[in-house]
């Protein structure tokens, strides 16, 4: 899959040597023809082989940037900023040479039974003018880097059960 994506991108004059190659004019041209083309970039990031040295370096950088940005989000107090903050996180990581992709999707949160809190859903919708149910960053070695889930609008004590930073390797 990875080599097929590399061939396709190169055939269309899209260089793949930098984490933000989706900003290349030829990539943008393809995305204008096919709005789902950005998914190919995410697949490229997911399928790309990474060295152990890269993974070790990336893990440290991702953790440090997520920690700083999470604190900024908490200090700001803005709720429901998942799309914006995930975009900012991915851009900072790209500037630091980290391969990543912003993921927009849905999210279900089940709370411990003792909490007496009901399951919370952030659903994506295929109809209407909605950006996303929720957004996070995929940045190998992490499948999920989410610094905004706790900063959504919740009722009751739900926030008490959600970590400020979620970093999952195998999702």
Residue ranges and their predicted role:
Residues 1-171:
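A structural boundary/capping signal
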């Amino acid at each position: 899959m990875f080599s097929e994506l590399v061939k396709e991108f190169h055939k269309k004059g899209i260089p793949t040597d930098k984490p933000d190659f989706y900003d290349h004019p030829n990539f943008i041209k393809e995305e204008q023809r096919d709005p789902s083309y950005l998914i190919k970039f995410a697949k490229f990031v997911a399928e790309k082989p990474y060295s152990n040295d890269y993974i070790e370096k990336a893990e440290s950088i991702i953790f440090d940037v997520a920690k700083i940005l999470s604190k900024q989000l908490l200090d700001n107090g803005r709720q429901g900023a998942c799309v914006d903050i995930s975009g900012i996180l991915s851009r900072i990581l790209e500037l630091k040479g980290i391969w990543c992709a912003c993921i927009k999707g849905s999210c279900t949160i089940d709370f411990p039974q003792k909490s007496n809190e009901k399951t919370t859903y952030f659903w994506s919708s295929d109809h209407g003018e909605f950006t996303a149910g929720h957004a996070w960053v995929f940045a190998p070695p992490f499948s999920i880097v989410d610094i905004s889930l706790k900063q959504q609008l919740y009722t009751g004590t739900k926030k008490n059960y959600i970590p400020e930073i979620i970093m999952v390797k195998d999702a």
